């Protein structure tokens, strides 16, 4: 297909401290989990041909102001590819079971497009996408998706982390012990089966007039 579904995640984190002992910010949830979900989806489609073409992007520099995604979004050599993206799915902190339960995520900026509605209408294997419950934190404008929003591309981030209670966000304890592997595996399979159902005919997400492209 000429139309593209794009998937992304940032692979950088915030580095280390000068303290002795365990001083490395591993970033298992933020954002090795998102990269894992993206790679898992690509692996799903190794043996299954989707109706859309697919693009996978791993960004550096998110923690420094979304530098990697900005560079790709503004690269004029990719302008023709960008014009064909029907939607970009950015995965950000998906290591835990969300407050909505297993196999469920929230989508930032749900009030700005019908992407979540279309996903839920085509959802497979129990996948459920909820509106962002932390809307006051402006998460839609704080992750790599916003670099593509500024180009008027449908782009949202998908997450499971509970921003009200998470104690590992940008902390040294964001390590492998945070990861719920069963849930992450379930998300990979559910997203794969859901994306497999999408076609350029049944999946045409649109922004509404509430979104800001600035």
Language model features with spans:
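Acidic/histidine-enriched alpha-helical segments
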Residues: 51-59, 88-91, 204-214
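Metal-dependent peptidase/peptidase-like ectodomains
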Residues: 59-163
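Short acidic/His/Gly/Ser-rich catalytic and metal-binding motifs that mark active-site loops
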Residues: 13-19, 97-100, 164-169
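Catalytic-core environment of secreted peptidases
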Residues: 1-57, 77
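Soluble non-cytosolic domains of exported or imported proteins
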Residues: 25-36, 48, 63-67, 109-113, ...
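Extracytoplasmic/secreted envelope proteins and their assembly/folding machinery
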Residues: 8, 35, 39-42, 66-73, ...
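His/Asp/Glu-rich mid-to-C-terminal helical/loop segments that flank catalytic regions of hydrolases
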Residues: 43, 160, 165-214
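Sec-exported extracytoplasmic/periplasmic mature domains
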Residues: 40-50, 74-78, 120, 124-127, ...
């Amino acid at each position: 297909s000429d139309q593209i579904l794009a998937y992304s995640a940032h692979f950088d984190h915030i580095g280390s401290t000068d303290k002795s002992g365990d001083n490395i910010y591993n970033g298992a949830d933020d954002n090795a989990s998102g990269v894992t979900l993206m790679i898992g989806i690509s692996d799903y489609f190794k043996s299954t041909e989707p109706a859309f073409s697919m693009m996978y992007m791993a960004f550096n520099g998110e923690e420094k102001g979304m530098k990697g995604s900005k560079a790709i979004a503004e690269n004029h050599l990719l302008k023709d590819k960008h014009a064909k993206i029907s939607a970009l799915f950015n995965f950000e902190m998906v290591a835990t079971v969300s407050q909505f339960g297993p196999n469920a995520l929230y989508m930032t900026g749900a009030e700005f497009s019908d992407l979540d509605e279309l996903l839920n209408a085509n959802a497979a294997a129990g996948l459920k996408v909820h509106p962002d419950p932390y809307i006051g934190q402006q998460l839609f404008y704080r992750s790599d998706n916003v670099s593509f929003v500024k180009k008027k591309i449908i782009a949202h981030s998908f997450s499971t982390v509970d921003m009200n209670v998470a104690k590992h966000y940008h902390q040294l304890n964001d390590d492998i012990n945070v990861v719920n592997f069963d849930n992450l595996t379930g998300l990979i399979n559910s997203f794969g089966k859901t994306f497999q159902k999408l076609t350029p005919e049944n999946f045409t997400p649109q922004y509404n007039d509430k979104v800001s492209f600035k």
